[in-house]
Amino acid sequence: MEWTRNRYRISDDKSELDLFWVVPAIQDSYWASGRSRAVIEQSIANSLTLGLYADGRQIGFARAVTDKCTFAWVCDVMVHQDYRHIGLGKWLMDCLGEHPDMADVAEQFLRTRDAHGLYEQYGYRVCDAMVRNREQA
């Protein structure tokens, strides 16, 4: 799928992803600091991904792990700092929600330390949860 707005475009085509942008962007995030390139590439291969592009250059990314009906975990939502605060993060979340793999998912989860206001606009709320963390190779 593809969405276009002026000079910006969002696509779910994994072959368009610029891994030379996506991998370091994820590795530089507070939630995935130090994550290996191999793990990031495997997570992309096994997820629904959206790339956000300005004039053909990657400036954003989001992914979701989902069974397409009951559960989805939204993660790695990011927009390059030079393109923030102009509505592109909202548009990325809109497109993710409209995607056929996500449109009918009953429960969608995410974990964040920031941007609570953005996610609350999409119906996300703080809830109790349990988590199991294991070291990755």
Specify the residue positions occupied by each region the protein language model found:
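Short amphipathic alpha-helix that is part of the acyltransferase structural core
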Residues: 1-35
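Conserved active-site alpha-helix within GNAT-family acetyltransferase domains
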Residues: 90, 102-137
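Short alpha-helical
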Residues: 17, 69, 114-117
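A conserved beta-strand-loop-helix scaffold within acyl/acetyltransferase catalytic domains
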Residues: 38-55, 59-78
